[in-house]
A protein has these predicted regions:
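A surface-exposed partner-binding patch
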Residues: 1-46, 120-263
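Compositionally biased, intrinsically disordered low-complexity regions
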Residues: 5, 37, 55, 60, ...
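Compact, glycine/acidic-enriched structural inserts
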Residues: 43-98
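Residue-level signal for secondary-structure boundary elements
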Residues: 82, 86, 103-107, 244-245, ...
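Hydrophobic, aromatic-enriched interface-forming segments
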Residues: 90-116
């Protein structure tokens, strides 16, 4: 999908900072960011999320897995657009064509049946690989991906492979629910990036210990200033000595946001 593709009900202007684990694809009207979620220095599988950073509703610091494949994300967005616009218009059709989606009429039919985007669970692209957001927070046992579920919170070893943005209880009555995150933070056995008051100091200790995965998870947790985070990812790239990661770090460091902004 090329950069010039017009995303219905989406925009390309990045209005607020985001953690380097996220590679943005588009921004929604609510200023959430849809994109690739890729963990470095970890065996976690890349996936696709909607990231709630600084939104029109305030700062949320929450990531939701919206698709385990790029096509799932596109199908989900098509469903939402068709529902909001009450059918397939020229812009939606052009977007589907540009993304190689040939069954937009089927998505239209599914949307007419009512329900939310989770009604796509019967579509061939989703069968056997549902994203975590298709499951209720209290019923995730059938999920087969590796985005953190609620069960992860009870495993210190599993939490070592997670960043803070991934641990939450979703929304309750349209408000963010941080019950799970708060419980993890109160557990003295949890990784330090869930508990620290200074991510930058913790990052330095983890990097000095050559714990690249821990340093990365720390860097992708809330309460960083961009100035500190820019220095941190530069130091991490130097230690990792990986060409692809260095390219990501350089791009992220040069994003057009002020040093005193937070993410």
């Amino acid at each position: 999908m090329r950069g010039q593709v017009r995303v219905p009900d989406g925009e390309r202007s990045l209005l607020s900072p985001f953690p380097p684990v996220l590679v943005p694809i588009w921004v929604t009207g609510a200023r959430t960011i849809v994109g690739l979620w890729k963990h470095w220095f970890s065996d976690r599988q890349p996936t696709f999320v909607e990231f709630y950073g600084t939104t029109v509703y305030g700062r949320r610091n929450m990531a939701f897995e919206r698709g385990r494949t790029l096509k799932q994300v596109i199908y989900g967005h098509l469903f939402e657009c068709i529902t909001n616009r009450d059918g397939v218009d020229d812009e939606i059709q052009a977007f589907a064509n540009a993304c190689g989606i040939s069954d937009v009429d089927e998505i239209d039919r599914i949307s007419i049946d009512g329900g939310d985007v989770t009604t796509l669970r019967s579509h061939a692209e989703f069968v056997g690989k549902l994203p975590l957001s298709f499951f209720d927070c209290d019923n995730q046992t059938d999920y087969t991906g590796d985005f953190p579920t609620n069960a992860v919170a009870s495993s210190t070893a599993a939490l070592q492979r997670c960043c803070v943005h991934e641990i939450h209880s979703g929304f309750q009555n349209l408000e963010p629910d941080y019950t799970l995150r708060e419980a993890v933070a109160q557990n003295s056995n949890s990784p330090e990036w869930f508990r620290t008051t200074s991510q930058s100091e913790l990052f330095e200790r983890l990097l000095n210990a050559n714990d690249l995965e821990g340093a990365w998870m720390c860097l992708n947790s809330p309460a960083w200033t961009l100035a500190n985070a820019r220095q941190a990812i530069t130091d991490l790239a130097a230690r990792a000595n990986d060409t692809a990661f260095s390219a990501l770090a350089t791009t992220w460091v040069n994003l057009p946001f002020a040093d005193d902004e937070m993410f």
